[in-house]
Amino acid sequence: MSSYSYDPYYTPYKRRVVESSPRVHIRSSYVSPSRTTYSPLVSTTMRRSYATSSSSSFLPSVDTMDLSQVAAISSDLKIVRTQEKVQLQDLNDRFANFIERVHELEQRNKVLEAELLLLRQKHNEPSRLRDMYEKEVRDVRLAQEEASGDRQTLRNERERLEDALRVLQGRYEEEAMSREDSEARLLDVRKEADMAALARVELEKRMDSLLDEIAFLKKVHEEELSQLQSQVQYAQVSLEVEVAKPDLSSALRDIRGQYEKLAAKNMQSAEEWFKSRFTVLTQSAARNTDAVRAAKDEMSESRRMLSAKGLEIEACRGVNEALQRQIQELEDKQSGEIAGMQDAINKLEEELRNTKSEMARYLKEYQDLLNVKMALDIEIAAYRKLLEGEETRLSFSGVGAITSGYTQSAPVFGRSAYSLQSSSYMTSRAFPTYYSSHVQEEQLDIEETIESSRAEEAKAEAPEEEEEEAAEEEGEGGEEAEEEGEEGEEAKEEEAEEEGGQEKEEEGEEGEGEAEAEGDGEEEGESKGDEAAEEESEKKEKKK
């Protein structure tokens, strides 16, 4: 006869065919409050041990059992089986939750490692920021030097233009002085021309007076001559009348000749003086006219040059004003650019400080997360140890119950963890003698790990400069602690297996008092583990 048993913990859900014999399952109403997991290996070994023990030790006693006892046992076995399934499903769900929690923590750890890598890259980036800042400063300095060079060039140009302006002003002053001299000479020439004109008018008047005098003298001479002629005629008549009168004609002719010579001489001298004076006045007038014309030409040329120089001066003034405005604009622009660059420098420095503070905050958060991770790893290791100890205890107690529980002829199958007469699993379960010491060792390890984590948290409050080194060292220490924890767990498992093999026979012979004492010890160990877990959770909440 074969029956199908369903194992829900295989990866592909399978049904196995097991040769069934009259098996007696063990009743237990205990529901473990501790966090345990189901191991397929333990399940298969327990089932095999149940099969072998039932096939070897229960076959002779089947004939002596009543059908009512068999029915009661089968109903009890069904109840125990359903309870076991419920417990195993609960443990499986809890184990799956633990695995999901571990995966979630691993994902968070990866995310935190990526963030740490980014933060380290950002921490290494200030050199590039410094290069960018120095490049920007160099560009600003080059621009400032170029602006200073342009400013110096403009200043030199301004000085050159100022020198040219001073030269032009000097020439303008010289031209003004020469103009004043020319105007003064022109005034003198005008005065001389006026004097020459007055002298000419005077000479003309004098010439008119002399001509009138000559005419008057001619008239007087003619009258005298006529008188003399009349007198001569009268004298001749009288002489003729008076027969012996003197001859006056020769004397008159002599006087007339003398007067004519004197008149001709005076006329010639007057004409010569008039001609010489007229020539002198004509030459002086012509000379003054040439001087006036030259002065007028020079004055017009001076006026033209003065207007040209005035235009040049105005142009130079406009250029000077434009250059001054350009210099002022360049100075304003440079001051604005320098202020902008200074603002950019201040902004970059502020960003650098913010980045450093943010990086320190990220490092602090990463340190806290590392501490939380280490605490969670410690808690997981503690739970793992508790689960492994529970599985070991269950396996050993199951084996001891099967080997030593059915030695009596009565339906009472011995005092084991799955005794049919036990009403509560908490009061009648039998533990190995070494399990209490094993739990105490685990509690000591947990306390040592907690102390080490506290010490590391105290070290985490070092200055910001040592945070990276401390984080790396703690990361390495965490890995070494995990490796040591795994090695210690493996060693403890090996020791547990060896001690379990040696003490399998002793477990069946232990009394009810020892089982209760060991149960109390296990309860104390579990309570200590729960207290340690609660302390860790409180620490996590405080840190958060």
From Swiss-Prot:
Stretches the record annotates as Coil 1B: 133-228
Region feature (Coil 1A): 88-119
Compartment(s) of residence: Cell projection, Axon; Cytoplasm, Cytoskeleton
Region (Head): 2-87
Region ranges (Disordered): 450-544
Cited PROSITE patterns: IF_ROD_1, IF_ROD_2
Annotated region (Tail, subdomain B (acidic)), positions in chain: 436-544
Segments for region (Coil 2B): 275-390
Annotated segments matching region Coil 2A: 247-265
Region of interest called Linker 1, as start-end residue ranges on this chain: 120-132
A Gene Ontology molecular function term of the record: structural constituent of postsynaptic intermediate filament cytoskeleton
List of residues that carry N-acetylserine: S2
Span list, region Linker 2: 266-274
GO biological process, any: neurofilament bundle assembly
Keywords: Acetylation, Cell projection, Coiled coil, Cytoplasm, Cytoskeleton, Intermediate filament
Region (Tail), start-end ranges: 391-544
Region (Linker 12): 229-246
Positions with biased composition (Acidic residues): 463-525
One GO term describing the cellular component: cytoplasm
Annotated region described as Tail, subdomain A, given as residue ranges: 391-435
Biased composition (Basic and acidic residues): 451-462, 526-544
Subunit structure: Forms homodimers (in vitro).
Family in the record: Belongs to the intermediate filament family.
Function statement: Neurofilaments usually contain three intermediate filament proteins: NEFL, NEFM, and NEFH which are involved in the maintenance of neuronal caliber. May additionally cooperate with other neuronal intermediate filament proteins to form neuronal filamentous networks.
Additional observations: NF-L is the most abundant of the three neurofilament proteins and, as the other nonepithelial intermediate filament proteins, it can form homomeric 10-nm filaments.
Protein name (database record): Neurofilament light polypeptide
Organism of provenance: Xenopus laevis
Organism lineage string: Eukaryota, Metazoa, Chordata, Craniata, Vertebrata
